Amino acid sequence: MRPMLPILALAAAAVPLAATAVARPETPKQALTAAIAAPTRTPTNVARDKYRHPAETLAFFGVKPSDTVVEVWPGGGWYTEILAPYLARTGTYYAAAPLPNGAKGVQALQARDAARYAKVRIAGFPAKPGDATVPDGGADVVLTFRNVHNWRFGGADQAQAMFDAMFRMLKPGGTLGVVEHRLPEVRDAAAEEKSGYLKESSVIGFATKAGFKLAGRSEVNANPRDTADWPQGVWTLPPSYRLGDTDRAKYAAIGESDRMTLRFVKPR
């Protein structure tokens, strides 16, 4: 039996080493990968990862697990399913939308999985009297995905007011990340009124007028097959398919819209 003692000693010594390896904290990249790969995500949302590129997009915006992040107008909660668990341990996630209707998608997620979304904070944006709000200067990152065209439909002044409000939300040095359907710069600006597409120069104009500095552009959400001249605007393409079965295979082959991905910073 004596020859077994060194082997047993080695095995015993390996236990704390293994425990140390298990206890090693995740890197931000690992935490984001885990959030994106979570089996709790809605399957139809997962199917759109190939168009929305959440890992690359959030990495470009520099979102860290310890950040206070405001998602403006989260809609059905596509990014909520990723951001809320990613930020749950050491960060904060705000879903900011017109209340009560604008938060219904996020509230549905909370009803489905209360534990996973327990720390989500819902705020009015624009806020009405009595709404919870995001404190001015309280956010490290503000994100909005494919919403600027909706604000533009209300007029340039409304869109500008939204950018002004997002500027106030951020700490000095904070980041604004914008993803939006992209209209080619050579097109008539009138197309912005109804197509759902905006020129990059228009979005940059709203942001810089609010006080932001453009810090970077990414083509991660680009789609060169999208010519942005469809009969029902951007909603002709998936996932909306506003024409129903008419030319559906054609539009499916094109895929989701061509999108700008812009990172702005609030000067210190």
Predicted region positions:
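C-terminal lobe and adjacent flexible extensions of AdoMet/dcAdoMet transferase-like proteins
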Residues: 247-268
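Conserved Class I S-adenosyl-L-methionine
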Residues: 189-217
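S-adenosyl-L-methionine
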Residues: 105-131
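A short acidic, Gly/Pro-enriched loop at the edge of an enzyme's catalytic core
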Residues: 132-142
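Class I SAM-dependent methyltransferase Rossmann-like catalytic core
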Residues: 32-64
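A short glycine-rich, Lys/Arg-flanked "PGG" loop and its adjoining helix->strand segment in the class I
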Residues: 84, 158-172
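Conserved class I S-adenosyl-L-methionine
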Residues: 65-75
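Conserved beta-strand signature within the Rossmann-like core of class I S-adenosyl-L-methionine
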Residues: 173-181
